[in-house]
A protein has these predicted regions:
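Cysteine-centered catalytic environments shared across enzyme families
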Residues: 1-341, 350, 354
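Catalytic subdomain that performs nucleotidyl-dependent activation
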Residues: 345-346
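Active-site nucleotide-sugar/metal-binding loop of Leloir-type enzymes
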Residues: 356-358
């Protein structure tokens, strides 16, 4: 994952901007970059996945110099989109998905988002029109938050990053608190703070003169359900299994595109076991499997590492078990809470699995 922050029209000094950007270092340890012009700041922390060369660092400027991009995510069909650009005489300088997004936008404008297959959040600054374009993937896998005050707008990958700019009010949203205490998480687009909202999944916005001038839903997941409801047909269990298997296999195969080693979080549950099986059948690369095991459950039926070890052996994966003691948890709790951008009852297992992978 990467992280970015974009300030549009606020009285933000460069030191406060850099301090906020540094907060994103855990999201992007490989490089840092800043582009600025008058009261416009774009900052990025990169985790390199495709084209590990410095030429793919961000913020990235388009070939025509008109557009500046910061981006978090992965575009799994970027190679076919790259070919499309080359076929249109675009002289690309990198092999990254970042440049593909940037030049596709320069070529086709906002409608290009419908061609992207993957998880993403990005902001593009148009130096000619003096406006920003921000978009988020259909499922909201990658975060994008928008903070506002009377003078302008700041966008960032994390809520805490926005607060560190000292430009956004910390007044809390009572409805968000109600959501957390009842559900264990906050329902988007709300956040814990009144003046910070998430960009909705499958939406894009245009921002000019410190204000959102248009908001568009470019992908509506509910239409998939409506389509399925209209086209009801009885199928056998065997046919159903085949459809699910083909769809899952197709999705997992798309995720195997990478210029860095591939790993899997293996919990021994049905879902991660299925993914492990599909991965092992569709790549010759060495796959690393990581399982988190808690000391209190060791040796019991709740110890997932026992089954996970057998699954990893079955699929020929290099297996790493990360054991967590009660003392480990007590020591790590402050860092876990710091990494937790919004209140939630979930995420501890993923935090430890990510720590093991790092």
């Amino acid at each position: 994952m990467c992280g970015f922050i974009v300030s549009l029209g606020l009285d933000l000094n460069q030191n406060d901007f850099k301090n906020a950007l540094n907060h994103l270092s855990r999201r992007g340890p490989d490089s840092e970059g800043i582009w600025s012009e008058n009261k416009i700041f774009l900052g990025s922390r990169r985790l390199a996945i495709f084209d590990l060369n410095d030429r793919s660092n961000q913020p990235m400027q388009s070939l025509c110099s008109r557009y500046i991009l910061v981006f978090n995510g992965s575009i799994y069909n970027y190679k076919s989109l790259r070919k499309h650009l080359i076929d249109n005489d675009v002289k690309l300088k990198t092999y990254s998905d970042t440049e593909v997004i940037l030049e596709l936008f320069a070529l086709e404008g906002p409608q290009m988002v419908s061609k992207l297959k993957g998880m993403f959040a990005f902001v593009i600054w148009d130096c000619k029109k003096k406006e920003a374009f921000a978009a988020r993937d259909p499922y909201g896998i990658k975060p994008l938050f928008i903070g506002t005050n009377s003078k302008g707008i700041i966008l960032a990958s994390q809520v805490k990053t926005l607060l560190l700019t000292k430009q956004i009010s910390t007044e809390r949203d009572i409805n968000s608190q109600f959501s957390f205490w009842n559900l264990g998480y906050i329902i988007e687009p709300r956040t814990w703070f009144k003046n910070i909202k998430a960009l909705k999944s499958g939406y894009y916005v245009r921002i000019k003169d410190g204000k959102i001038i248009s908001e568009m839903q470019w992908y509506d997941l509910s239409k998939n359900w409506i389509s399925a409801d209209k086209n009801k047909q009885r199928i056998s269990k065997k046919e159903c299994n085949k459809i699910i298997k083909n769809s899952l296999t197709s999705s997992v195969k798309k995720h195997l595109v990478s210029d860095v080693p591939i790993g899997i979080f293996l919990s021994s549950g049905v879902d991660s076991t299925l993914v492990a099986g599909i991965v092992s059948s569709n790549t010759k690369k060495k796959i690393i499997a990581i399982t988190v095991s808690f000391e209190n459950f060791e040796g019991s039926e709740n110890d997932e590492s026992i089954k996970a070890k057998k699954i990893a052996q079955k699929y020929g994966m290099e297996h790493h078990i990360y054991r967590v003691t009660q003392k480990d948890f007590q020591n790590d709790l402050p860092e876990i809470l710091e990494a937790m951008d919004q209140p939630t009852i979930d995420g501890v297992n993923v935090w430890y699995a990510s720590k093991a992978a790092a």
